[in-house]
Amino acid sequence: MKHILLLLLLITNNLFAQDTYTIQGHFPKFPNSNFELKGYEGFQEKVLLKTSSNEEGKFTLTYPANYVGVAQLYMNGAYSNLLFLNQENYTLFWQDLTKREDMQITGSKEYEAFLQGMKTFQEAEAKLAGLNYLVPLYAADSIKQQVFIKELDTVNNLFSNYVKSLPENIWVRQYLLTKGLIEQMPNSVKTYPWRAPQHVTEFMAIDFKALKHSGLLKELVEGYTYLVERFPLEEVYPLLEQAIDKAVIEFKDNPTIQQEVAQHWFTFLESHSLFKAAEYLALKMLNNESCTLNEKSTALFEQYRKLAVGNTASDINLGSGTTLKKLKNKYKLVVFGASWCP
Protein backbone atom coordinates (compact mmCIF):
# COMPACT_ATOMS: atom_id res chain seq x y z
CA MET A 1 0.00 0.00 0.00
CA LYS A 2 2.86 2.38 0.87
CA HIS A 3 4.46 1.72 -2.52
CA ILE A 4 1.18 2.56 -4.29
CA LEU A 5 0.82 5.83 -2.37
CA LEU A 6 4.42 6.77 -3.16
CA LEU A 7 3.85 6.04 -6.85
CA LEU A 8 0.70 8.18 -6.86
CA LEU A 9 2.60 11.06 -5.23
CA LEU A 10 5.35 10.86 -7.84
CA ILE A 11 2.81 10.82 -10.68
CA THR A 12 0.97 13.79 -9.16
CA ASN A 13 4.19 15.77 -8.78
CA ASN A 14 5.12 15.11 -12.40
CA LEU A 15 1.67 16.12 -13.63
CA PHE A 16 1.79 19.42 -11.78
CA ALA A 17 5.47 20.23 -12.36
CA GLN A 18 5.81 23.80 -13.59
CA ASP A 19 7.06 24.46 -17.10
CA THR A 20 7.46 28.17 -16.39
CA TYR A 21 7.99 30.43 -13.40
CA THR A 22 7.02 34.05 -12.87
CA ILE A 23 8.50 37.20 -11.39
CA GLN A 24 5.97 39.84 -10.38
CA GLY A 25 7.47 43.32 -10.65
CA HIS A 26 6.29 46.68 -9.34
CA PHE A 27 8.20 49.87 -10.16
CA PRO A 28 5.61 52.52 -9.14
CA LYS A 29 7.53 55.50 -10.55
CA PHE A 30 7.87 53.93 -13.99
CA PRO A 31 4.44 53.12 -15.43
CA ASN A 32 4.01 52.08 -19.07
CA SER A 33 7.68 51.14 -19.39
CA ASN A 34 9.30 48.50 -21.59
CA PHE A 35 11.22 45.62 -20.02
CA GLU A 36 13.61 43.13 -21.53
CA LEU A 37 15.02 40.09 -19.75
CA LYS A 38 18.32 38.93 -21.24
CA GLY A 39 20.07 35.70 -20.34
CA TYR A 40 23.19 33.88 -21.48
CA GLU A 41 23.97 30.84 -23.60
CA GLY A 42 27.68 30.21 -23.29
CA PHE A 43 29.39 33.41 -24.41
CA GLN A 44 26.28 34.74 -26.13
CA GLU A 45 23.62 37.01 -24.66
CA LYS A 46 20.05 36.24 -25.67
CA VAL A 47 16.64 37.80 -25.08
CA LEU A 48 14.46 35.61 -22.87
CA LEU A 49 11.36 37.81 -23.04
CA LYS A 50 9.98 41.30 -23.51
CA THR A 51 7.07 42.85 -21.64
CA SER A 52 5.63 46.20 -20.52
CA SER A 53 4.36 47.58 -17.23
CA ASN A 54 0.83 48.93 -16.79
CA GLU A 55 -0.20 52.39 -15.60
CA GLU A 56 0.62 51.35 -12.00
CA GLY A 57 4.12 50.24 -12.91
CA LYS A 58 3.31 46.54 -12.49
CA PHE A 59 4.55 43.83 -14.85
CA THR A 60 5.07 40.06 -15.05
CA LEU A 61 8.16 38.20 -16.24
CA THR A 62 7.83 34.54 -17.21
CA TYR A 63 10.88 32.32 -17.66
CA PRO A 64 11.23 28.61 -18.54
CA ALA A 65 11.92 26.03 -15.85
CA ASN A 66 14.93 24.70 -17.76
CA TYR A 67 16.73 28.04 -17.69
CA VAL A 68 18.90 28.00 -14.57
CA GLY A 69 21.32 30.89 -14.37
CA VAL A 70 21.57 34.67 -14.35
CA ALA A 71 19.70 37.26 -16.37
CA GLN A 72 19.85 41.01 -16.77
CA LEU A 73 16.60 42.96 -16.48
CA TYR A 74 16.64 46.08 -18.67
CA MET A 75 14.07 48.87 -18.41
CA ASN A 76 13.58 51.19 -21.38
CA GLY A 77 16.95 49.98 -22.67
CA ALA A 78 18.84 51.69 -19.83
CA TYR A 79 18.47 50.63 -16.20
CA SER A 80 19.50 47.04 -15.55
CA ASN A 81 19.83 44.69 -12.63
CA LEU A 82 21.07 41.16 -12.08
CA LEU A 83 18.47 38.46 -11.42
CA PHE A 84 18.86 34.78 -10.62
CA LEU A 85 16.54 32.24 -12.23
CA ASN A 86 16.20 28.77 -10.74
CA GLN A 87 12.60 27.57 -10.66
CA GLU A 88 11.44 30.25 -8.24
CA ASN A 89 8.37 32.49 -8.27
CA TYR A 90 9.23 35.79 -6.60
CA THR A 91 8.50 39.52 -6.53
CA LEU A 92 10.44 42.70 -7.31
CA PHE A 93 9.77 46.14 -5.88
CA TRP A 94 11.87 49.15 -6.80
CA GLN A 95 10.80 52.60 -5.68
CA ASP A 96 13.85 54.60 -6.75
CA LEU A 97 15.84 53.20 -9.67
CA THR A 98 18.74 55.58 -8.98
CA LYS A 99 19.40 53.58 -5.80
CA ARG A 100 20.27 50.07 -6.94
CA GLU A 101 20.61 48.84 -3.36
CA ASP A 102 16.95 49.72 -2.67
CA MET A 103 15.52 47.04 -4.96
CA GLN A 104 13.54 44.56 -2.86
CA ILE A 105 13.36 40.93 -3.96
CA THR A 106 11.03 38.69 -1.98
CA GLY A 107 10.79 34.91 -2.26
CA SER A 108 14.14 34.16 -3.90
CA LYS A 109 16.59 32.00 -1.94
CA GLU A 110 19.04 32.39 -4.81
CA TYR A 111 19.14 36.18 -4.53
CA GLU A 112 19.36 36.09 -0.73
CA ALA A 113 22.32 33.72 -0.93
CA PHE A 114 23.96 35.95 -3.53
CA LEU A 115 23.62 39.12 -1.43
CA GLN A 116 25.04 37.44 1.66
CA GLY A 117 27.82 35.92 -0.42
CA MET A 118 28.88 39.25 -1.91
CA LYS A 119 28.76 40.89 1.52
CA THR A 120 30.98 38.13 2.95
CA PHE A 121 33.35 38.42 -0.01
CA GLN A 122 33.78 42.19 0.30
CA GLU A 123 34.29 42.07 4.06
CA ALA A 124 36.83 39.24 3.78
CA GLU A 125 38.85 40.95 1.03
CA ALA A 126 38.95 44.21 3.03
CA LYS A 127 40.20 42.44 6.19
CA LEU A 128 42.67 40.41 4.16
CA ALA A 129 44.33 43.57 2.84
CA GLY A 130 44.89 44.87 6.37
CA LEU A 131 46.21 41.60 7.77
CA ASN A 132 48.48 41.03 4.79
CA TYR A 133 50.00 44.44 5.49
CA LEU A 134 50.47 43.76 9.22
CA VAL A 135 52.10 40.31 9.06
CA PRO A 136 55.53 41.42 7.73
CA LEU A 137 55.58 44.42 10.09
CA TYR A 138 55.74 42.06 13.09
CA ALA A 139 58.63 39.95 11.81
CA ALA A 140 60.57 40.81 14.98
CA ASP A 141 57.69 39.77 17.25
CA SER A 142 56.94 36.16 16.35
CA ILE A 143 54.12 35.77 18.89
CA LYS A 144 52.09 38.68 17.55
CA GLN A 145 52.96 37.75 14.00
CA GLN A 146 51.58 34.24 14.50
CA VAL A 147 48.33 35.74 15.80
CA PHE A 148 47.99 37.78 12.62
CA ILE A 149 48.94 34.81 10.43
CA LYS A 150 46.26 32.68 12.07
CA GLU A 151 43.68 35.44 11.61
CA LEU A 152 44.80 35.86 8.00
CA ASP A 153 44.15 32.18 7.34
CA THR A 154 40.69 32.42 8.95
CA VAL A 155 39.74 35.49 6.91
CA ASN A 156 41.11 33.93 3.73
CA ASN A 157 38.66 31.04 4.12
CA LEU A 158 35.59 33.09 5.13
CA PHE A 159 34.12 33.37 1.65
CA SER A 160 34.87 29.82 0.53
CA ASN A 161 33.40 28.44 3.76
CA TYR A 162 30.23 30.44 3.18
CA VAL A 163 29.90 29.11 -0.37
CA LYS A 164 30.47 25.53 0.81
CA SER A 165 27.75 25.97 3.43
CA LEU A 166 25.09 26.64 0.78
CA PRO A 167 22.78 23.74 -0.21
CA GLU A 168 23.77 21.85 -3.36
CA ASN A 169 20.48 22.75 -5.07
CA ILE A 170 21.19 26.49 -4.78
CA TRP A 171 22.59 27.38 -8.22
CA VAL A 172 24.18 30.61 -7.00
CA ARG A 173 26.63 28.39 -5.10
CA GLN A 174 28.46 27.74 -8.39
CA TYR A 175 28.04 31.35 -9.47
CA LEU A 176 29.62 32.70 -6.29
CA LEU A 177 32.46 30.18 -6.43
CA THR A 178 33.24 31.26 -9.99
CA LYS A 179 32.65 34.99 -9.57
CA GLY A 180 34.73 35.06 -6.41
CA LEU A 181 37.57 33.27 -8.18
CA ILE A 182 37.43 35.70 -11.12
CA GLU A 183 37.61 38.67 -8.74
CA GLN A 184 40.39 37.19 -6.59
CA MET A 185 42.81 35.94 -9.26
CA PRO A 186 44.11 39.37 -10.43
CA ASN A 187 44.60 40.46 -6.80
CA SER A 188 46.47 37.26 -6.04
CA VAL A 189 48.79 37.86 -9.00
CA LYS A 190 49.55 41.42 -7.89
CA THR A 191 49.34 41.32 -4.09
CA TYR A 192 48.75 37.83 -2.66
CA PRO A 193 50.96 35.38 -4.63
CA TRP A 194 50.78 32.95 -1.69
CA ARG A 195 47.06 32.53 -2.50
CA ALA A 196 47.57 31.51 -6.14
CA PRO A 197 47.90 27.70 -5.59
CA GLN A 198 44.52 27.52 -3.85
CA HIS A 199 42.90 29.06 -6.95
CA VAL A 200 44.01 26.03 -8.98
CA THR A 201 42.07 23.77 -6.61
CA GLU A 202 39.07 26.12 -6.73
CA PHE A 203 39.11 26.21 -10.54
CA MET A 204 39.20 22.43 -10.78
CA ALA A 205 36.23 22.21 -8.37
CA ILE A 206 33.97 24.36 -10.57
CA ASP A 207 31.10 22.60 -12.33
CA PHE A 208 31.48 23.96 -15.87
CA LYS A 209 28.15 22.51 -16.96
CA ALA A 210 26.39 24.65 -14.35
CA LEU A 211 27.91 27.79 -15.91
CA LYS A 212 26.05 27.43 -19.20
CA HIS A 213 23.78 30.38 -18.34
CA SER A 214 26.20 32.29 -16.08
CA GLY A 215 27.82 34.74 -18.48
CA LEU A 216 31.15 34.05 -16.72
CA LEU A 217 32.90 31.57 -19.02
CA LYS A 218 34.96 34.13 -20.94
CA GLU A 219 36.24 35.86 -17.79
CA LEU A 220 36.94 32.50 -16.15
CA VAL A 221 39.22 31.03 -18.83
CA GLU A 222 41.01 34.35 -19.38
CA GLY A 223 41.51 34.99 -15.67
CA TYR A 224 42.79 31.47 -15.01
CA THR A 225 45.23 31.65 -17.93
CA TYR A 226 46.49 35.03 -16.67
CA LEU A 227 47.01 33.49 -13.22
CA VAL A 228 48.73 30.28 -14.32
CA GLU A 229 51.13 31.86 -16.81
CA ARG A 230 52.83 33.51 -13.82
CA PHE A 231 53.59 30.18 -12.15
CA PRO A 232 57.09 28.65 -12.50
CA LEU A 233 57.62 27.68 -16.15
CA GLU A 234 57.69 23.93 -15.44
CA GLU A 235 54.19 24.19 -13.91
CA VAL A 236 52.49 26.42 -16.49
CA TYR A 237 51.74 23.93 -19.27
CA PRO A 238 50.75 20.97 -17.06
CA LEU A 239 48.26 23.23 -15.25
CA LEU A 240 46.85 24.64 -18.49
CA GLU A 241 46.54 21.17 -20.03
CA GLN A 242 44.73 19.94 -16.91
CA ALA A 243 42.31 22.88 -17.18
CA ILE A 244 41.76 22.30 -20.91
CA ASP A 245 40.97 18.63 -20.28
CA LYS A 246 38.40 19.63 -17.67
CA ALA A 247 36.60 22.12 -19.92
CA VAL A 248 36.52 19.83 -22.96
CA ILE A 249 35.26 16.85 -20.97
CA GLU A 250 32.61 18.73 -19.00
CA PHE A 251 31.12 20.29 -22.13
CA LYS A 252 31.16 17.06 -24.16
CA ASP A 253 27.35 16.95 -24.13
CA ASN A 254 27.11 20.54 -25.35
CA PRO A 255 29.30 20.75 -28.49
CA THR A 256 28.23 24.30 -29.34
CA ILE A 257 29.49 25.76 -26.07
CA GLN A 258 32.45 23.37 -26.06
CA GLN A 259 33.63 24.77 -29.40
CA GLU A 260 32.87 28.34 -28.36
CA VAL A 261 35.02 28.00 -25.24
CA ALA A 262 37.76 26.18 -27.16
CA GLN A 263 37.90 28.79 -29.95
CA HIS A 264 38.13 31.71 -27.56
CA TRP A 265 40.61 30.02 -25.26
CA PHE A 266 42.77 28.95 -28.21
CA THR A 267 42.94 32.53 -29.52
CA PHE A 268 43.66 33.86 -26.03
CA LEU A 269 46.49 31.34 -25.50
CA GLU A 270 48.06 32.32 -28.82
CA SER A 271 47.80 36.03 -27.99
CA HIS A 272 49.78 35.32 -24.80
CA SER A 273 52.40 33.28 -26.71
CA LEU A 274 51.37 30.10 -24.90
CA PHE A 275 51.73 28.14 -28.13
CA LYS A 276 52.30 24.74 -26.56
CA ALA A 277 48.98 25.01 -24.69
CA ALA A 278 47.24 26.31 -27.84
CA GLU A 279 48.55 23.30 -29.77
CA TYR A 280 47.40 20.96 -27.00
CA LEU A 281 43.91 22.46 -27.11
CA ALA A 282 43.78 22.31 -30.92
CA LEU A 283 44.76 18.65 -31.07
CA LYS A 284 42.41 17.84 -28.17
CA MET A 285 39.49 19.22 -30.15
CA LEU A 286 40.55 17.65 -33.46
CA ASN A 287 40.86 14.23 -31.82
CA ASN A 288 37.61 14.63 -29.91
CA GLU A 289 35.38 11.85 -31.24
CA SER A 290 32.32 13.03 -29.30
CA CYS A 291 32.20 16.37 -31.14
CA THR A 292 31.78 17.25 -34.81
CA LEU A 293 33.65 20.49 -35.36
CA ASN A 294 32.15 23.29 -37.38
CA GLU A 295 34.12 24.87 -40.26
CA LYS A 296 35.46 27.72 -38.15
CA SER A 297 36.81 25.37 -35.47
CA THR A 298 38.32 22.99 -38.00
CA ALA A 299 40.12 25.78 -39.86
CA LEU A 300 41.36 27.30 -36.61
CA PHE A 301 42.71 24.09 -35.09
CA GLU A 302 44.03 22.31 -38.22
CA GLN A 303 46.94 24.73 -38.52
CA TYR A 304 48.62 23.02 -35.59
CA ARG A 305 48.14 19.52 -36.94
CA LYS A 306 49.28 20.37 -40.49
CA LEU A 307 52.15 22.62 -39.45
CA ALA A 308 53.35 20.60 -36.46
CA VAL A 309 57.12 20.45 -35.96
CA GLY A 310 58.59 17.59 -38.01
CA ASN A 311 55.82 17.49 -40.60
CA THR A 312 56.73 17.88 -44.27
CA ALA A 313 54.89 20.69 -46.01
CA SER A 314 53.00 19.64 -49.13
CA ASP A 315 54.40 20.70 -52.48
CA ILE A 316 52.78 23.72 -54.11
CA ASN A 317 51.44 23.49 -57.66
CA LEU A 318 52.41 26.66 -59.53
CA GLY A 319 50.72 25.71 -62.80
CA SER A 320 52.06 24.59 -66.20
CA GLY A 321 53.50 21.48 -64.61
CA THR A 322 55.74 23.49 -62.29
CA THR A 323 55.82 22.97 -58.55
CA LEU A 324 57.69 24.72 -55.75
CA LYS A 325 59.94 21.71 -55.30
CA LYS A 326 61.03 21.79 -58.96
CA LEU A 327 62.20 25.41 -58.84
CA LYS A 328 66.00 25.66 -58.88
CA ASN A 329 66.14 29.22 -57.59
CA LYS A 330 68.68 29.88 -54.86
CA TYR A 331 66.11 31.83 -52.81
CA LYS A 332 62.35 31.27 -52.57
CA LEU A 333 59.81 33.53 -50.91
CA VAL A 334 56.62 31.72 -49.95
CA VAL A 335 53.64 33.67 -48.59
CA PHE A 336 50.88 31.74 -46.85
CA GLY A 337 47.32 32.96 -46.51
CA ALA A 338 43.93 31.53 -45.63
CA SER A 339 40.32 32.57 -46.16
CA TRP A 340 39.58 32.39 -42.43
CA CYS A 341 42.35 34.86 -41.55
CA PRO A 342 41.08 38.36 -40.68
Model regions: which residues?
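N-terminal "domain-start" segment that seeds a small globular fold
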Residues: 290-325
